[in-house]
Amino acid sequence: MSFELTRRQYADLYGPTTGDSIRLADTELFLEIEKDLTVYGEEVVFGGGKVIRDGMGQNGQVTRDEDVPDTVITNAVILDYTGIYKADVAIRDGHIIKIGKAGNPQITDGVDIVIGASTEIIAGERKILTAGGVDTHIHFISPDQVPTALTSGVTTMVGGGTGPAEGTKATTVTPGKWHIQRMLQATEGMPINIGLFGKGHASAVEPLAEQIRAGAIGLKVHEDWGSTTSSIDNSLKVADEYDVQVAIHTDTLNECGFVEDTIRAIGGRVIHTFHTEGAGGGHAPDIIKIAGLPNVLPASTNPTLPYTRNTIEEHLDMLMVCHHLNPDIPEDVAFADSRIRAETIAAEDVLQDLGIFAITSSDSQAMGRVGEVITRTWQVADKMKKQRGVLKDPAGGAHGSEDSDNFRLKRYVAKYTINAAIAQGMADSIGSVEEGKFADLVLWDPAFFGVKPELVLKGGQIAYALMGDANASIPTPQPRTMRPMFAAFGKAVQQSSITFLSQAAIDAGVPEELGLQKVIRAVSGIRSLSKADLKYNDATPDIQVDPETYKVTVDGEDVTCEPADVLPMAQRYFLF
């Protein structure tokens, strides 16, 4: 016998379904559910008098050896580059093993996830599930960045550094074997995935190659160490040999050549460009044009995202501190001024919206904010909708109804998840909500989406969660704050997080030599990449910058936007 529910009643009980829309935080962005893999009337829900009980939604006869999941997230709305849909998500041995319909096949048809006595339940009803964020521009200045990143929904940190040394405060570099191996050991107790960049500055190849064999997953070329054409070429030669990435912060002062010289030195080889607009550093005033090349994987850092009335004013002091400049030296001030251009910053939001810039990252404590990658990405998406309207798929693909924001949502979620993972050769393990991936997942209340997660899972175990007073009689009394959970303690840290290394370092026995206990994965497939491999952000137009006015054009059309006066996902959510 069937029973009819209104959409509101159904959403209250089991979460929204196909055709329903969800507003993301206090933005003007609306997610529309494209499909529902659960079965109407057979939804699994946990609780007193609910479905997931022995002989009902739970099969009491199967053992864990019969591929029963360790955890099922029920009735969650998944927001991912792969789609926007509702499903049950099964996790086993720290990986996503199935996305579909959970329950007990003895009493329900269409079940492809069997809930057993070994299965924990996380209620995903009325929640949004995303992949953990991947931040590819980390200055490892302070260990306190790790919980800050995790509590924002970022589960992977890629970059370089040794602590608050001058080299680290300016450049994402962990220089040399000794520092690389000490940092690998230091991060063993941190419940986050880690990858380190070596220093990409040497006039010979071997000083670079030895860093890759020591455990670096790539090389960083930075102007503060001298972003010369020889450094670029040698780093890329080593990268080609060992299948690792080269990240670059180019030459603001144009001392060693102009952007055209850097492009020639790169020579068509794949490279990951940081803060490609230029305020964070790079050929003045036209580094932004490199984003149109098919071999360049271009990123923004979050200080310039989105463009607001305060963006220009705050940058000068940040830059002076981060790059060890002296405000009493006119040349240092001129250097800083040359990097801060309202015209190129105004173009950056639009280039993100057009899918030309493909990645967002933080530049943590070195002009960027490690806990704001996700928030600022969605602030840009909201600002662009308000200024440019609904974004349509230029390929004509179907992404929900005519006025849905689904295409824009897929483009923007890809920027800090799958595209960042692809750029660093990590996408086989992380970066999306797909079967076979490491279960780094973030569960959001829609009202707090992109601002404050409800749960952060690392390798299938809860690492951080919104939690109330531990002395209270229930979990929810105020103050509710993001607090470390059991995956952040003891030996669980090693089983729930990944240390990424080069294959050469693994072959050389670095994990055994250093006694590394985290899950070890090799980066791979990097040197064959092109921008076409990036999801929803693969545009390669002709970008030009007027050297006098700094006006930016894309295929001959002016590209700019107005600064925002007010942003969503801001003071409404934060006291400080």
UniProtKB/Swiss-Prot annotation:
The keyword Cell membrane does not apply. It catalyses: urea + 2 H2O + H(+) = hydrogencarbonate + 2 NH4(+). Residues 132-576 form the Urease domain. Keywords: Cytoplasm, Hydrolase, Metal-binding, Nickel. Gene3D superfamilies: Metal-dependent hydrolases, Urease, subunit C, domain 1. One of its GO terms (molecular function) is urease activity. Ni(2+) 2 binds at K220, H249, H275. The keyword Transmembrane helix does not apply. HAMAP family: Urease_alpha. Heterotrimer of UreA (gamma), UreB (beta) and UreC (alpha) subunits. Three heterotrimers associate to form the active enzyme. This is Urease subunit alpha. The gene is ureC.
